From Swiss-Prot:
Protein name: Transmembrane protein 267
GO cellular component annotations of the record: membrane
Subcellular location: Membrane
Transmembrane segments: 77-97, 114-134, 178-198
Gene this protein is translated from: TMEM267
Superkingdom of the source species: Eukaryota
Membrane-topology annotation of the record: Multi-pass membrane protein
Organism: Homo sapiens (Human)
UniProt keyword terms in alphabetical order: Membrane, Transmembrane, Transmembrane helix
Keyword match Transcription: no
Length: 215
């Protein structure tokens, strides 16, 4: 059980100066990266476009989790790398739906693949949380459902500026305004961090790492 001092510290760190600066940097990255991807040199080359787009998803996932955990913490960077992997790996469902490893087939699908349904996110997160509770992994891996939520949500929000959000079984929304994508992406780590505090996850993470968390 976390002490009152740990609880107070975790609450104060949800909006520290460092994390606010980091999230502003994340917003700026979104602005610049997605504008650069519009260059004709990238758009005219399928491989370059696909790899660049996926790389941006990866960086946003890594950056978002770094904001949550604190970029100055003395733990391994494996979590941040894992967050980037989770944010980018979603796109493999393009190849599953295409039934082929052909990039051309993956980019010309008749419909959106299943991992791009936003309803999947809470289902997978809650299933993961239940599984961790069942196998008593909830302390050592308490961060994993939150990491998955942030990584996948950031991917869906970014895709939403082109295609809208696909919310099964209700259909899809209109494409998201670019400014809304930037605001949601840069504020999502803080929202999750605060909810993690309310659920006690931040305190468990602080105890696990043995250092302060700078968010």
């Amino acid at each position: 059980m976390a002490s009152e001092t740990e609880k107070t510290h975790a609450l104060l760190q949800t909006c520290s100066t460092e994390s606010l600066i980091s999230s502003l940097g994340l917003g700026a990255f979104c602005l610049v990266a997605d504008r650069l991807l519009q260059f004709s040199t990238i758009q005219q080359n399928d491989w370059l476009r696909a790899l660049s787009d996926n790389a941006v998803h990866c960086v946003i996932g890594m950056w978002s989790w770094a904001v949550v955990t604190g970029i100055k913490k003395k733990t391994d960077f494996g979590e941040i790398i894992l967050a980037g992997f989770l944010a980018s790996v979603i796109d493999v469902d393009h190849f599953f739906l295409a039934g082929s490893m052909s990039l051309k087939a993956a980019l010309t699908l008749p419909r959106r693949p299943f991992l791009h349904c936003s309803t999947v996110i809470p289902v997978v997160v809650l299933t993961l949380k239940f599984t961790m509770h069942l196998f008593k992994l909830k302390d050592s891996w308490c961060f994993l459902p939150w990491m998955l939520f942030i990584s996948w949500t950031s991917h869906h929000i970014r895709d939403g500026i082109r295609h809208g959000l696909w919310i099964c079984p209700f259909g899809k929304t209109s494409p998201l305004p670019f400014w809304l994508y930037v605001i949601i992406t840069s504020s999502l780590p803080h929202i999750c961090s605060f909810v993690m505090y309310l659920t006690g996850t931040r305190q468990m993470m602080s105890s696990k790492h043995g250092v302060r968390i700078d968010v």
